[in-house]
Amino acid sequence: MSRMAEQQLYIHGGYTSATSGHTFETINPANGNVLATVQAAGREDVDRAVKSAQQGQKIWAAMTAMERSRILRRAVDILRERNDELAKLETLDTGKAYSETSTVDIVTGADVLEYYAGLIPSLEGSQIPLRETSFVYTRREPLGVVAGIGAWNYPIQIALWKSAPALAAGNAMIFKPSEVTPLTALKLAEIYSEAGLPDGVFNVLPGVGAETGQYLTEHPGIAKVSFTGGVASGKKVMANSAASSLKEVTMELGGKSPLIVFDDADLELAADIAMMANFFSSGQVCTNGTRVFVPAKCKAAFEQKILARVERIRADDVFDPQTNFGPLVSFPHRDNVLRYIAKGKEEGARVLCGGDVLKGDGFDNGAWVAPTVFTDCSDDMTIVREEIFGPVMSILIYESEDEVIRRANDTDYGLAAGIVTADLNRAHRVIHQLEAGICWINTWGESPAEMPVGGYKHSGIGRENGVMTLQSYTQVKSIQVEMAKFQSIF
């Protein structure tokens, strides 16, 4: 693909040049080619985006629930019509295989938007009787202008996960995509405008997180920030949001999630689940189950089943429909993952497979890392304690149920957890003791629109998806009505 035209900001229903004069490049990680130069939003751009959003939000919130619902449903239709085009752009920008982006990224994002479009008429208040002559009623009102700050691993899906409930509740959103993968969020803005969203209700500001993102979190005109990213960045976002104007926050942060295989599990099923929990999207999924706990007596058999499945991974041209494994999102991220792999070797973990870059035709110019499995791991190893966010699995052995629950919970993270077992009683008994916000039994990774997702501990605050997220983008107003004559004590 030839280099794209310089990408601008999207404010008030159209493209506009950044006033900052700063730009950055977005790179195709499969081959190192520059896809586009992208303009970066500065403080003045944030100010005008907020002013635009405030204007648009008043128009949007004044529409009826059904009017808003119809506009968002039109956006869903356009997303599905343009699925293949958007998936190709997502593949170029992220490096993910087209077989994945064309069936998951846009599809699941559109599903979330359709879900919230259908929920809009359900936003309602309540009536509370006090006495014969007085009652209280409540209203759910939008927050106003909110900000979304996205991560680089699921660019358009995250933009939809954040914008769908925000817009459904009557808010306007200013969205800052990751500077690593900024392109499809701009296309989403086009689609919202085409569907009939009032100008200003969805503005997109590409830029560097430490600048554009910080301006958004500090701006007094923004009522809430929804952030997806790493724990360290999330803490800064939360601190800035609170210090500036006590903004509400939703934080979807990192994870180091446990996958527990019990001794009664079907090891074929367990190996399939472990592969999906570690190598889907080349391991760049926040919920990945990278700490795989296996009974000591099952370790050798389990390792052989994992090795057999790694042999079946197809890393190749990302647009080949048979390819199911792509490069990492960027060269700096590849280098970071390689540092973790080197640390694992240094600390005594045994490399079962992988452990280096992929080499040869089609790989040498890209950010490719081989699917890597470490075994003979211990809980104190760096690769077991820290989030790597790459195709790196760590296998650990255990002896008892109580032991594995304790060790699974021995982490600052609490995003996800899963177990594989044939015992239904054990499944629920154990899952109820795991300190994680998203849990799976005999499966892994699905996050449907109806399912609230979010973490415990350092893995986040608040939830995305589900009914409760729609409500989190509203504020409750209570109104007392008195029908009898008011009695003053003065």
Curated annotation (Swiss-Prot):
InterPro entries associated with the record: Ald_DH/histidinol_DH, Ald_DH_C, Ald_DH_CS_CYS, Ald_DH_CS_GLU, Ald_DH_N, Aldehyde_DH_dom, BADH
Gene designation: betB
Superkingdom per UniProt: Bacteria
Name of this protein: Betaine aldehyde dehydrogenase
Keywords attached to this entry: Metal-binding, NAD, NADP, Oxidation, Oxidoreductase, Potassium
Annotated positions binding K(+) 1: 26-27, 93, 180
Keyword NAD attributed: yes
Gene3D superfamilies in UniProt: Aldehyde Dehydrogenase, Chain A, domain 1 (3.40.605.10), Aldehyde Dehydrogenase, Chain A, domain 2 (3.40.309.10)
Binding site for NAD(+): 150-152, 176-179, 230-233, 254, 286, 387
Classification of source organism: Bacteria, Pseudomonadati, Pseudomonadota, Gammaproteobacteria, Enterobacterales
The enzyme's E.C. designation: 1.2.1.8
Catalytic residues as annotated in Swiss-Prot or TrEMBL: 162, 252, 286, 464
Any one GO MF annotation of this record: metal ion binding
Note on how the cofactor is bound: Binds 2 potassium ions per subunit.
Swiss-Prot/TrEMBL cofactor(s): K(+)
Site positions (Seems to be a necessary countercharge to the potassium cations): 248
UniProt-listed Pfam families: Aldedh
